[in-house]
């Protein structure tokens, strides 16, 4: 598979290149603040950079008819509309978290909340001091799995890649469910799984859950 990275020189960009190269995939497109280096035609473009970069990413995907794996957070409606339009021409996977564990947790929460429907629920998320958006896209994703609005507490400290705790409470007992990303590698592994999934797919919007669970 030939692939491109938007945000190539960033921390996630470097992690993505490392994981993809270990699987023998060829990097043919590099995009960062210094410009664009085009070495070939990618099958898939991976972008974990910023919402501001999305117009250029969309332009490149259209140019090369390349699928898009998008892990950028803090997207606005205008960005989502760009993706909907792009998905008419190429396959797209967009997710706020490419950790397989988080997406398994999301599915689990959607079932658990049916049993604990009268319990209090709150979410606590912790990320590194450089993360700009709060609450995190992942916390919002987990809230959506609960099917209702719940309090979300955001901490920005040190170099934490990502901790999410969902707390259920009732009189006399609590349940805490925690997911911890130990390194950014987990997100790069998820991006790889999504990129390989997209190769040969028809145009359209695909969820990361479809990548993991198939058509279930």
Curated annotation (Swiss-Prot):
It is an enzyme of class 1 (oxidoreductase). (S)-2,3,4,5-tetrahydrodipicolinate binds at residues 128, 137-138. InterPro entries: DapB_C (IPR022663), DapB_N (IPR000846), DapB_N_CS (IPR022664), DHDPR_bac (IPR023940), NAD(P)-bd_dom_sf (IPR036291). Keywords: Amino-acid biosynthesis, Cytoplasm, Diaminopimelate biosynthesis, Lysine biosynthesis, NAD, NADP, Oxidoreductase. Pathway: Amino-acid biosynthesis; L-lysine biosynthesis via DAP pathway; (S)-tetrahydrodipicolinate from L-aspartate: step 4/4. It comes from the Bacteria. It catalyses: (S)-2,3,4,5-tetrahydrodipicolinate + NAD(+) + H2O = (2S,4S)-4-hydroxy-2,3,4,5-tetrahydrodipicolinate + NADH + H(+); (S)-2,3,4,5-tetrahydrodipicolinate + NADP(+) + H2O = (2S,4S)-4-hydroxy-2,3,4,5-tetrahydrodipicolinate + NADPH + H(+). Catalyzes the conversion of 4-hydroxy-tetrahydrodipicolinate (HTPA) to tetrahydrodipicolinate. GO terms for biological process: diaminopimelate biosynthetic process; lysine biosynthetic process via diaminopimelate. GO terms for molecular function: 4-hydroxy-tetrahydrodipicolinate reductase; NAD binding; NADP binding; oxidoreductase activity, acting on CH or CH2 groups, NAD or NADP as acceptor. Belongs to the DapB family. This is 4-hydroxy-tetrahydrodipicolinate reductase. The active site is at 127 (proton donor/acceptor), 131 (proton donor). Its EC number is 1.17.1.8. Pfam families: DapB_C (PF05173), DapB_N (PF01113). CDD domains: DHDPR_N.
